[in-house]
Amino acid sequence: MKKQDFTTTIIVGQTPSQVFNAINNPQNWWSGEINGSADKLNDEFTYRYKEFHLSKQRIVEMIPDQKVVWLVTESIINYAEDKKEWTGTKISFEIAEQNNKTQLRFIHLGLDPDIECFDSCSNSWSQLIQQGLFSLITTGKGRQIFLG
């Protein structure tokens, strides 16, 4: 049986271009410290949230207004036994027009129920996409999800 990668979907009234541009500014919706760039193919950036999470992403696929894929090239999840369990996974954003709205399908390929951080990581992604990124797309201002 195929393992189910984590996925969540939002639908907004903004254009695919607006959704695409918001995705490519993770510092405005992914709560934590971000260094580097996510503007174009092969860009790299690091993400850190306190002492819990550090990861490095490289943009490996970018189709304007349609799709963005990040490859996690390094990761340290401090509360997991396998601290590198995100390394080699891919984070995909698929954009599609649907009934005069824009659908964004988020998939973390490799984040499945067998991964130790699945529950906490999938909960965090749900909040980040459904609240943080959604707010950035719909209001122009991202929302900090993890406070304190």
Regions found by a protein language model. Give the residues of each.
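Short coil-to-beta transition motif at edge beta-strands of beta-rich domains
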Residues: D39-Y47
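A conserved amphipathic terminal alpha-helix motif
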Residues: G110-G148
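Hydrophobic-ligand binding "helix-grip"
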Residues: S31-G36, H53-N99, L109
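Residue-level preference for beta-strand/loop junctions
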Residues: K2-Q4, E51, T87
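Generic structural detector for well-ordered beta-strands
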Residues: T9-I11, T46-R48, R58, E94
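Hydrophobic ligand-binding cavity/cleft-lining segments
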Residues: M1-A38
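Hydrophobic pocket/interface hotspot
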Residues: V19-F20, F45, I59, W70, ...
